[in-house]
Amino acid sequence: MAPLLLVLWASLVSMELTGGMMVNEVPAQNLSCFECFKVLQASKCHPIECRPNEKVCVSNEVLLYTSTKRRTQISKRCATACPNSNNVIEWSLGNTQARITRRCCSGDRCNRAPGSWEGFWSLPGRLLLPMGLGLFCTLL
């Protein structure tokens, strides 16, 4: 039983290191990003394939809020280069607060809104099974 678990663990680790897929010759694909313009919800953005010269994904979020109201406008697109660095600009005018968040990234669909499963715990979640099997084999 222990040798079988060891083989299973080794195959899972090798799959993790290769990105979970077999290594084959695959033709190069263009970058894909989410695209939308001044929508109120990130769920209204849809994935598109960028042109060959577009190498980054850009997202802008404009947030206006008061003590009783909140309005967000989201825009996302492909771009040839980052228009500016990632930044957050905040200001206030009377009782209205405003924030513009600009982000630029270079991975496929990297400009999506983070879901509840993403962020800090996403990498440990992907490694949990191989690490758990490794610990199990060690205890045998």
UniProtKB/Swiss-Prot annotation:
Residues 1-20 form the signal peptide. Residues 117-140 form a propeptide. GO terms for cellular component: plasma membrane; side of membrane. PANTHER family: LYMPHOCYTE ANTIGEN 6H, LYMPHOCYTE ANTIGEN 6L. The keyword Membrane applies. Disulfide bonds join C33-C50, C105-C110. Residues 31-124 form the UPAR/Ly6 domain. This is Lymphocyte antigen 6L. It is a lipid-anchor; GPI-anchor. It comes from the Eukaryota. The keyword Lyase does not apply. SMART domains: LU. Keywords: Cell membrane, Disulfide bond, Glycoprotein, GPI-anchor, Lipoprotein, Membrane, Signal. A lipid is attached at S116 (GPI-anchor amidated serine). It is found in: Cell membrane.
